[in-house]
């Protein structure tokens, strides 16, 4: 097992040096990025990303995208955000902050420049009103970075939908 691990490390080093020489975006080590927010359920997403980083024996980074709306956040939301940042630090994440109003672009650009292999985000339970609605954060990220693994964790308990079955009547 030790020799297999050493062989894998050697292959990683060779691949990494080849990646640097060819200026490629492919990385061999796992680097998990979690997106921070003031959502009440963001703690669940942070814990999930931490478990992934531990399972993959990878680097764990937590990213907050500060937009121009940040100063207008309520004190309750700011406190929740601070609590989520503190939780990520406790779980071993390196905290990073980027600035910009296009959140999806900021996340994917940070991921590309930092060698992130997996992004963990929360899924809002907000429903779209119609087909031509603005794309969600996740949809934008998928377009901007098709080569990254993006894990979407539901913000709240998933709603189970019942499949309607046709009622059969028995004729007597």
Model-identified regions with their sequence ranges:
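Structured cytosolic domains appended to multi-pass membrane proteins
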Residues: 1-161
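Cytosolic-side membrane-insertion boundary helix
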Residues: 159-172
């Amino acid at each position: 097992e030790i020799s297999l691990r050493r062989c894998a490390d050697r292959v990683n080093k060779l691949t990494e040096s080849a990646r640097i020489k060819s200026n490629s975006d492919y990385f061999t080590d796992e680097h998990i990025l979690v997106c921070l927010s003031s959502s009440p359920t963001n703690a669940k997403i942070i814990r999930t990303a931490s478990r992934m980083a531990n399972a993959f024996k990878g680097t764990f980074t937590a990213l907050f995208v500060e937009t121009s709306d940040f100063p207008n956040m309520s004190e309750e939301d700011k406190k929740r955000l601070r609590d989520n940042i503190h939780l990520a630090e406790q779980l071993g994440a390196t905290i990073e902050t980027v600035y910009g109003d296009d959140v999806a672009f900021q996340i994917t650009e940070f991921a590309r420049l930092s060698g992130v292999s997996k992004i963990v985000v929360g899924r809002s339970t907000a429903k779209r009103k119609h087909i031509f609605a603005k794309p969600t954060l996740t949809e934008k990220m998928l377009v901007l970075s098709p080569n990254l693994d993006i894990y979407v964790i539901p913000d709240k308990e998933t709603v189970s939908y019942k499949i309607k079955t046709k009622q059969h009547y028995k004729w007597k």
